[in-house]
């Protein structure tokens, strides 16, 4: 619980930080009011005269409204255009289901504009229904039943509208034929249906979805009115689609144009197939609401299309087709009670979302389309339309429409990327007669620049002059410590005593250096500061002049600085790698390395030059070194050699002195006698142990019992077998020959 309580303030802080960051005004490369308002939705411009001080850039005028007010700009001088929408009230509201008719939106990049669209459902004045049926061999039973439904269908349409009309078309062997234009004559509808015959083939009518698109786009041929439009497809077969990212695998894609010639669909030589995108687009574009009536075994297959086609209704066809009229009634009730608000194609820099407030009390904000269900006649629903732009744009138009209904809203979008400033032409004298006053700043004539057009440029603009007062594009003009006058920085006088500001960009001063003993550069007697660096007087060194130049602490007893293996800094040795402070005299482990030179010592002692080639870094000395000793080393013969190593200053070569005499251990007679005695004792002990073991074994053997006396033989043993000898045959033959 404590962790949750701790987390809440953190989350609140993060939200506050995000809100604060969203209100920041980024004003890179801003020099005019237009640049300012285009740089971000939170930026405003102050057009007050003389708002900036001497040398201050015009970008100071660009900031958030709150910051500009704090800087002394009053609200009357703020230029801060806001996105807004103006709706044109509909004088014919009672005759329309969707209002308003027109909306004009003024849109500033990054700042949303909102407006409301109301939809009120009324009874339809006109409903057109086109009946499209697949007539493959398997449709014989359905055709017979549908042929008697003409009056029932028209009666169903007139129940839901003031004027209903029906039309008919068929699909036979992948070919669509438009048979009856939309009409209010149910008898004619029935007569045309009775003329139809099913195909003798049982093949699937593969062109049925292409026929759906032809019905949708051939407006004149079908006879669609500006009212509610329904397309009923009755089929007992699967569908085929062109290859796209959703469904289907075929390759020949329809061109989306009307190809009816005297009622017959004329393809381009090979069958065309619709993609889901084409199908949904053409139905929505022409405001046609599809109803697909299929047998129960095909319902799940066709329901896949509902994901991609808005307001598509799938009905289950009974075995005797008697429920077609009721399916149409149910589909109309369902489709008419669902209101889906959508818009035509818009450029990618514009974004439109919808907040839906439905009649049943539900709401659905921030969606790419408006959506309310359960809308009954005379119910009103409201949609809030939100539109934003990512950048400045040209004038745009788009339309908002409720799918399945003819009414639409025309939206005109205009960019807010220019400043509407106060008239200031009377203040042209502030520009020295060489420019005009606009939005609080001088717009200089060609050849002049500067805050008051006081600089004669022969080409460079005011912005170019300001650029010469910056070290780089990311730096502040004159480092924020000076004024840019005609392209040159005039540095301010500091209010801190003895502080001086100077440099081409006012980037230098005489105080921002390292300190020693609480003073800049150790005080004036040690050095002085210039542009962030200490310049020391004679006798002092160091980044803060903290060190004296004396080297007494770096000299060894031979008066060599750091023993030649380092440098003296601040009277202390900084030793080279491998040498030890304080005077860099010996390497770490120097005495341990004596043993490494033992073989060289013996080699040099024996004066065997050929064997001593690996001792190139040793210099043999005949003179012993004072106070330089090494422990002695012993060889395999027991002789001890004493030698001394010495490394001179400023050299990596060791000198070696080897003591002339070898100390070898001598073997005395007493030592020999002791060795003999020990050997004899060990031999006697071995013989005694052997005899004792032998006697014990003999005694154990004598105690074993004897059966049958000493005459016992192997033949008496239970496992013994008498050997059997057979005389070789060759021996007998040999005797016979003899």
Curated annotation (Swiss-Prot):
Keywords: Cell membrane, Disulfide bond, EGF-like domain, Glycoprotein, Inflammatory response, Integrin, Membrane, Repeat, Signal, Transmembrane, Transmembrane helix
Signal peptide: 1-22
Tissues showing expression: Expressed predominantly in maturing and mature neutrophils.
Main location: membrane
UniProt xrefs under Gene3D superfamilies: 6.20.50.10, Laminin (2.10.25.10), ligand-binding face of the semaphorins, domain 2 (3.30.1680.10), ntegrin, alpha v. Chain A, domain 3 (2.60.40.1510), von Willebrand factor, type A domain (3.40.50.410)
Ranges of the Cytoplasmic topological domain: 693-738
Region named Disordered: 709-738
Modification after translation (UniProt): N-glycosylated.
Comp. bias (Polar residues): 710-719
Matching InterPro entries: EGF_extracell, Integrin_b-2_sf, Integrin_beta_N, Integrin_bsu, Integrin_bsu_tail, Integrin_bsu_tail_dom_sf, Integrin_bsu_VWA, Integrin_dom_sf
Listed transmembrane segments: 672-692
Similarity annotation: Belongs to the integrin beta chain family.
Other facts: The human orthologous protein seems not to exist.
Name of the protein in question: Integrin beta-2-like protein
Lineage: Eukaryota, Metazoa, Chordata, Craniata, Vertebrata
Name of the gene: Itgb2l
């Amino acid at each position: 619980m404590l962790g949750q309580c701790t987390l809440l303030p953190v989350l609140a802080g993060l939200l506050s930080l995000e809100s604060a960051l969203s209100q920041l005004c980024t004003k890179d490369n801003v020099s005019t009011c237009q640049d300012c308002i285009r740089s971000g939705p939170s930026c405003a411009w102050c057009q007050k005269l003389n708002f900036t001080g001497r040398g201050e850039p015009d970008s100071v005028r660009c900031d958030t409204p709150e910051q500009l007010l704090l800087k002394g700009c009053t609200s009357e001088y703020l230029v801060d255009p806001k996105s807004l929408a103006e709706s044109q009230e509909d004088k014919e509201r009672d005759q329309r289901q969707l209002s308003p008719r027109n909306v004009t939106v003024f849109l500033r990049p990054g700042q949303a504009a909102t407006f409301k669209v109301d939809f009120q459902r009324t009874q339809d004045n006109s409903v057109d229904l086109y009946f499209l049926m697949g007539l493959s061999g398997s449709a014989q039973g359905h055709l017979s039943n549908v042929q008697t439904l003409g009056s029932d269908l028209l009666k169903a349409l007139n129940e839901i509208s003031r004027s209903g009309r029906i039309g008919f078309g068929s699909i036979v062997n992948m070919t669509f034929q438009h048979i009856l234009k939309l009409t209010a004559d149910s008898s004619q509808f029935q007569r045309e249906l009775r003329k139809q015959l099913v195909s003798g083939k049982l093949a699937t009518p593969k062109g049925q979805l292409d026929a759906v698109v032809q019905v949708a786009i051939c407006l004149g041929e079908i006879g669609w009115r500006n009212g509610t439009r329904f397309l009923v497809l009755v089929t007992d077969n699967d569908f085929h689609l062109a290859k796209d990212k959703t469904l289907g695998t075929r390759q020949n894609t329809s061109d989306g144009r009307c190809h009816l010639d005297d009622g017959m669909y004329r393809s381009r030589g090979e069958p065309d197939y619709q993609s889901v995108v084409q199908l949904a687009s053409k139905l929505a574009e022409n405001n046609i609401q599809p109803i697909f009536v299929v047998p129960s075994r095909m319902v799940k297959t066709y329901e896949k299309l509902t994901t991609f086609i808005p307001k598509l209704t799938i009905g289950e066809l009974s075995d005797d087709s008697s429920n077609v009229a009721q399916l149409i009634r149910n589909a109309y009730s369902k489709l008419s009670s669902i209101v889906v608000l959508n818009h035509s194609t818009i450029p990618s820099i514009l974004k439109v979302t919808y907040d839906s407030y439905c009649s049943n009390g539900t709401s659905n904000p921030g969606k790419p389309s408006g959506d309310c269900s359960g809308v009954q006649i005379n119910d009103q629903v409201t949609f809030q339309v939100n539109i934003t732009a990512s950048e400045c744009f040209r004038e745009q138009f788009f339309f908002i429409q409720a799918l399945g209904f003819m009414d639409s809203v025309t939206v005109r979008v205009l960019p807010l990327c220019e400043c509407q400033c106060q008239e200031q032409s009377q203040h042209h004298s502030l520009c020295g007669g060489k420019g005009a006053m606009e939005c609080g700043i001088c717009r200089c004539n060609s050849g002049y620049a500067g805050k008051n057009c006081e600089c004669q440029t022969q080409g460079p603009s005011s912005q170019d002059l300001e650029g010469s007062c910056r070290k780089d594009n990311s730096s502040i003009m004159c480092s924020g410590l000076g004024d840019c006058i005609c392209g040159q920085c005039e540095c301010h006088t500091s209010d801190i005593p003895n502080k001086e500001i100077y440099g081409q960009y006012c980037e230098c001063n005489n105080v921002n250096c390292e300190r020693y003993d609480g003073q800049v550069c150790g005080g004036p007697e040690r050095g002085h500061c210039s542009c962030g660096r200490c310049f020391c007087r004679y006798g002092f060194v160091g980044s803060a002049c903290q060190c004296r130049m004396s080297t007494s602490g770096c000299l060894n007893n031979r008066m060599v600085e750091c023993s030649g293996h380092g440098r003296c800094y601040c009277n202390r040795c900084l030793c080279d790698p491998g040498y030890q402070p304080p005077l860099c005299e010996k390497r770490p482990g120097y005495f341990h390395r004596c043993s490494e030179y033992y073989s060289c010592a013996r080699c040099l002692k024996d004066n065997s030059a050929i064997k001593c080639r690996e001792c190139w870094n040793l210099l043999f000395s005949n003179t012993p070194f004072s106070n330089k000793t090494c422990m002695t080393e012993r060889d395999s013969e027991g002789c001890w050699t004493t030698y001394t190593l010495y490394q001179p200053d400023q050299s990596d070569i060791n000198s070696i002195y080897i003591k002339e005499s070898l100390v070898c251990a001598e073997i005395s007679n007493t030592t020999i006698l002791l060795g003999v005695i020990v050997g004899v004792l060990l031999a006697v002990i071995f013989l005694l142990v052997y005899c004792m073991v032998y006697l014990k074994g003999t005694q154990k053997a004598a105690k074993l019992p004897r059966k049958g006396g000493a005459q016992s033989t192997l033949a008496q043993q239970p496992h013994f077998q008498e050997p059997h000898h057979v005389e070789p045959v060759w021996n007998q033959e040999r005797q016979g020959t003899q």
